[in-house]
Amino acid sequence: MKRFFRLSAALAALALLSGCASLLHPRLVEDLQLIQTIGFDGGIGDMTVSVSSGEASEDAVSAQLAARGASIQTAVQRLQDFSPREELFFAHIRYAAVGEDCARGGITPILDYFERGTQTQLSVPLFVVKGESAYTLIAANGGENEITAALSSLEADTKRQGSAHCFTVLEIASRLNRSGAARACAIAPPAPERSVPEAEDGATLALEAGYAVFRGETLCGFLDTDAALGADLLLGFAPQASYVLPDGSGGTVTVQLHTAKASLSPVRNGGEAAVRIAVRVRAGVTESSGADTADAAMLARLEEELSRAVTAQIEAAAEASRTLDADFLELWRVLPEVKGEGVLASLRTLVQTESVLERSYDIYGSAHGKEESEHG
């Protein structure tokens, strides 16, 4: 399988960057147009590159530019013709976006561009624009609703809410190299029926839309919210997600995850193989409509409900992995034969979840909600 990330090339790039000061000619800052967001559309032989310079300051002009070329590099060179400044500067790119059609055609050229570039950085988060082109998103977000600000806000929100992880170019390339599959944070404009009071004159803001899944270099599908959170729980991205649980008397109790730890182990029975997934989550009660969460029986009931919800999310992630035939859960680590053709599609997963609920100001001894299911 083609390697998506070459250590030797990365080391060479680092060597170049360590001496970049001697390679750059002195230039006035006011002559530079700093690019903060870059977008990619099209495919091999016909690439469109869109860029945004970020929020404008009092003495600077925010610019959104786009150009086509036979490759990313030629499109980038053509961008210079449209720049109001003397030179475009790409060393401060904060975000990258790929249109859905471009992602379905393959992202190897994009990963290669970031890997080899002397100005580009591998630590840049890479988003997939679901159902749209990157050009549409960047061009529609200008002025006060500039795309860089929108993506910065989205990144901060996902970290705070635990709703997604913004995978970087390096993380995506590394996972493709070792697992043949990877995820990227998916974004989408709000649907027409969804009002965004903060938006002005129909501005298109970027909303988190689960995960895009890559098998090899190509986009093969998307994960919905439940499957996305289930994958995060398994892969150690400790979320701070909230769950609204029924209290059994018509009310609800809201809890927020504190920690989530997962362990995977192989299960072999004759010629059949499965993966056992054991998850332990700790959560805190943040809101109640009236239930006595100090009551041991109520606490045990809520733990059972939380276990049921977490189990369903992990099952959704495992089912998506089978359906897409993409091992983005990295099950091969405990069951190497998963890398064999057709093995993943028929792999069974056994999910066991243990939940512990606590209150920040008074931790109670609790019965642990457990639920085990077999799915496959």
Predicted feature locations:
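Membrane-proximal alpha-helical signals and transmembrane carboxylates
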Residues: 2-9, 17-376
